[in-house]
Amino acid sequence: AAGLTDRGTLEDTPVALWDRLFAVNARAPFLLMQQVVRGLKAAGKPGAIVNVITMSSHGGQPFLTGYSASKGALATLTKNAAHAERAARIRVNGINLGWADTPGEHAIQAKDGAPPDWLSRAAPQQPFGRLIEPRDVAGLAIYLLSDAAEMMTGALIDFDQNVIGAYG
């Protein structure tokens, strides 16, 4: 999964950053999906695609305007492709990933001036005591790609410790 998470609000996001976010988070997955679908159809085979999206596709924090919009576009593309390709038995689903402990997140935290121990401070504040790790998501991705999920397409699964719309 590729992704770009650079920060910017509605007022201060330069057009160049907006374009870069959409190039990485929406255009690149579109081009990859296009080639996969063409290849599967040419071979006459069914298949499955899983897009790694983000919880921010639901709206996101104010400092993630371009990121949230680009991942929202990927969420829409995921649903559109799922509908368009179901007759060819090509399934397309997405994972809306919550706050995760990844090298990219560490780089963003450092760039934003977070102290070196930011993770040890942030983890205990999470409902389950840590950030999501890639190994947590791997099982879901494997399931979505497997025959066990052969009747599932167009799903956007929220993989997070928080529940959208639940307060208190």
Label each region the model flagged.
Residues 9-10, 17-19, 122:
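Substrate-binding pocket helix/loop in short-chain dehydrogenase/reductase
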Residues 11, 59-65, 87, 129, ...:
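Active-site loop immediately N-terminal to the catalytic Tyr-X3-Lys motif
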Residues 33, 70:
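Active-site helix of classical SDR
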Residues 38, 83-84, 150:
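Alpha-helical segment proximal to the catalytic Tyr-Lys
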Residues 54:
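Residue(s) in the substrate-gating loop at a strand-loop-helix junction
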Residues 59, 142, 153-168:
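Short C-terminal tail/terminal secondary-structure segment
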Residues 86, 91, 152-154:
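Short, small/polar-rich loop/turn modules that mediate ligand/substrate recognition or access, typified
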